[in-house]
Amino acid sequence: FTGLIAKIVTKMVKEPEKKEETAFRLKYINAGPLATPELATEQAIKEIIHFAEISRNGLGYARAAINENDSDKFEELRSKLVKYEEISDRIEYEIATFLNAVSTGEISESTMFKIKSMYKIIGELESLGDSGESISRILSRRNSHNKSFDAETIKKINSMIDIVDNAYRIMIQNLQLASEGRLTDISNAYNAEERINNFRNDLREEEINSLEDNRKNYQTSVYYMDVVSELEKMGDFMIN
């Protein structure tokens, strides 16, 4: 069991990486020998928290892309969001491979439960990376049709991102508490999701009213609501 994990992780570490990607390597899962499956799961949850922090950084790039008017700078940010999606895929795969190796050994029922939970968490974190890349594609389509968001629309999106970022903070905090065996209440997570949903509903209602009053361009509103919808999905991924 230990030898298998060592071989898998050694292969991960030795795979060539571009300089830009070195910050996204596995941080807590290493090629050293593991004493027990329990220790391995402790390392895995730390890696998952690190994964969540990387994912939160991706939201920052999405915000920057939404606020960027210069086409060249936007393309740089769009490329970063595509890269973050690829990084999320890779990290999910590497953690899942590690967990799979751990689960092949003799493990307790409680450890197996933890591993199953971790599989679900890394799947949701990977989906968060997909959402960031989806936002970049929505913005690219908007730009290709020579549409843009006015200052008020961008202000509303930034407010939505603030709420989503707070949900990220709560998710990471809860993961940390769970790793320490101190998580007893996750009502803060459900409250964060409800806040995201309520704000999404408010923005949608406002936009429908603006369209009915002919105060907004329909196609621009579609792009705007698509961005808001993608941000709302991110809240769902954090809670599921």
Residue positions per predicted region:
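Cytosolic, long alpha-helical scaffolding segments
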Residues: 1-240
